[in-house]
Amino acid sequence: MNLTTLTAKDGFQLTAYVVKPRGIPRGAIVVVQEIFGVNSHIQSICDRLAENGYVAIAPAMFDRIHPSFESGYTPEEVTQAKALMQSFNIETALLDLEAARGQVATAGNVGIVGFCLGG
């Protein structure tokens, strides 16, 4: 798996899924997960972006609350994911996104796309 560790400005370390394209990158995209974590769906989006020439990085936005959280889409998993949102802090989330952007900044222009949690 293509995991890396990011360090936010406040010193917190979080995991991110990162994929690089073959050849010179066209830029980079930060992929903000759904409430289900950096699961296989989010990883597949990153993989497709890399196939199209972009460095793609998906920081694990729940690592501060529930490290390595990822789930599927059953009603029980939806309930669990929604419960995590009660503890989600936007200020620290922005620090984590900034760390992700910094990790891929050498690829050129950096965009961001969000799904559910970040959409």
Model-derived features: positions:
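N-terminal cap/leader regions of alpha/beta-hydrolase-fold enzymes
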Residues: M1-G119
